[in-house]
Amino acid sequence: MKAQGYTELYAVYGCSMGGSVALLVALGQLIKIKHCVMDGGITPYQLPWIVTRFIALKDYLMMMIGRTGGVGLLEKAFATDEYTKEDLQYVADVLRHCSRKTLWRTFDSCNNYKVPDPVPTIDTKLHYWYTNGEEKERKQDIAYIKSKFPQTEFTVLPELGHAGLVLLKPELFEQMISELSD
């Protein structure tokens, strides 16, 4: 990005596993970033290594089921009330084009990353968004962010389901990104 003349980004955004990527990009400080938004972002597991392997395996197998079974199986395996058939078909198509190795590495790296210790001082404003209905699911992630990054601004979204903001309410997403506080 610097080679292209960019010296600063307004924001990086990541949802779920992408939240872990957004956080690591902000912590890396390779370019100035004003805002880092983790939307239901996954924080590093605070569990024994062997337990994290089983969690990664479960997640991987769920994705492989979706990859193999297509839309019909995705409808049975996941809460899909908010998504249209076209949305689910898109997910099935994307999964079908991902290799098994790519899916495994995705879960392994996004769930088991390390935050530098001590946490570096950054000028980036951190934001953690989660929906009203997923507070229990995100309890450990929220506690982790509060302990490691006490300056984080937390926002509770309307009930959209996990990862529903961008897909289901793109206008609200655009408004929220535009209105991030400096």
Give the predicted meaning of each segment.
Residues 122, 128-130:
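Short beta-strand/loop motif that positions the catalytic acidic residue
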Residues 157-171:
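Catalytic histidine-centered segment of alpha/beta-hydrolase-like enzymes
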